[in-house]
Every structure is written in C-alpha cells, then in structure tokens.
Amino acid sequence: MHCPFCSAVDTKVIDSRLVAEGHQVRRRRECLLCHERFTTFEMAELVMPRVIKSNGSREPFNEEKLRGGILRALEKRPVSMEAIEKGVNHIKSCLRATGEREVASQLVGNLVMDELKSLDKVAYIRFASVYRSFEDIREFGEEIAKLEK
C-alpha cells in the first residue's frame, strides 16, 4: 500500500486485529521511507444477488431500500439502531448464502418479515399489512392471532 504522506510504495504492517465482529481487519502501518504511521481497514467485497421483482423486472440489490423499509416499519418503536443494523446484515447474509446470482423479491420480503417478527411484533404487523396488502381488519386479526400462538 502506498504511503498517504510521501507516496512511497513500501509500507509495513505493524499490527492487525479483527474489528466489526470479525467482518473487518484493522491494520496499523508504517512507511519505510518517511516512518509515518497510519491505519487502514480491510473488508471483503461481497457481491449481492440481483432482485427479480414481481413484475419480472430485475434490479440491483439496494441496501438503502431494505434499511428504509425496516426503519419505516420500526418508526417510533423501541428498537436500537444496533439491532436494526444486525437485522439488515443478517438479511444480506441470508441472501448471499443462497449462492444465487438472482433472488425473487418475495424472498427478500419474507426475510424482512422474519427479522421484524424477532425484533418487534408491532413493526412486523405494520410491514405485513403493506407487504401482503391487507384489505380489511379481519386480515390484521388473523395475522395477530398467528403471532399469539
């Protein structure tokens, strides 16, 4: 890695440690020419599958869209941002674990519902009512009854 201070080509790693629950490596480096020290962070670049929408169109996976939908469902609910980020990362891991280049939007929606069910039941019902297009109060009641079992 080039030195950010003098642009020298040679640097050496002084210290390496795992951070971000083991998903990132923090490296402390020293330039062999100017002896300045600096920190770098390294993480795997993982490709997310494309999403096949219900109308048949395809689009790249959009993490912000995923996070936005979850945040909307959890609005004014007592769930920490840390728990939300863990949920987003869990959904992304599940999608990558399929090993597929493309996944149906229904799979993404079902993963979101599963995650919301474990985070907050009210948010789950909010999301389910939109995702499953509830038509009347009876459908809300049926979904709530399933949760109470």
From Swiss-Prot:
It holds the Pfam family ATP-cone. Binds 1 zinc ion. GO terms for biological process: negative regulation of DNA-templated transcription. InterPro entries: ATP-cone_dom, NrdR-like_N, RNR_NrdR-like. Keywords: ATP-binding, DNA-binding, Metal-binding, Nucleotide-binding, Repressor, Transcription, Transcription regulation, Zinc, Zinc-finger. GO terms for molecular function: ATP binding; DNA binding; zinc ion binding. Disulfide bonds: none annotated. The keyword Ligase does not apply. Its cofactor is Zn(2+). Residues 49-139 form the ATP-cone domain. A zinc finger (unnamed) spans 3-34. Belongs to the NrdR family. NCBIfam families: transcriptional regulator NrdR. Negatively regulates transcription of bacterial ribonucleotide reductase nrd genes and operons by binding to NrdR-boxes. This is Transcriptional repressor NrdR. It comes from Aeromonas salmonicida (strain A449). The lineage of its organism: Bacteria, Pseudomonadati, Pseudomonadota, Gammaproteobacteria, Aeromonadales. The gene is nrdR.
